[in-house]
Amino acid sequence: MSAKKQKGRRPPVWVSQNFLTSHKTIERVLRRTNLRADDHVIEIGPGKGHTTGRLLQKCRKVTAIEIDGKLYAGLLEKFSDAENLRLHHQDFLKWKLPFSGRYKVFANLPFCYTTDILRKLTESKNPPVEAWLTMEKGAAKRFLGKPRETLRSLLIQPKFDLGIVYYFRREDFHPKPGVEVINNAKIKLW
């Protein structure tokens, strides 16, 4: 199947999934966040769990949503003893966000779903207090309204503080992404 959307069908996640595998980079990115020991963090697409393990050490509760069956099974095995992990085998776009309570989001987004996921997070009745999202540079700039405002940037900016906090190297991922630069965008509720 082509990576392009076909008549309302979404491409499979694997067509745009690049796993963040550099442990040094994961540590660098996590140090730049405001994640604390008492936080509840929702991780979208934990993949092989490279970041999940660090989130479990750093935060009170981690809820991870993984759509891929093989990756989900691997996560179940890898984190079988983790008491502060709630793991869901589900499509995040169909998963219900918490109706109440504070939570933060950390995600290495599949590039073809960035807009859909960002829309779900920002249009929720109980949006995250912060979201740390790894996305393609061009998408991040569009959400920031650079070089010019877009409808999406105009809708997001009044309620959320957006910014780029880290530029990745392609070598930080496997497989290496085909896009020029990957970055981590911070979205904070005003």
Predicted segments — roles?
Residues 1-190:
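Catalytic cores of RNA-modifying enzymes
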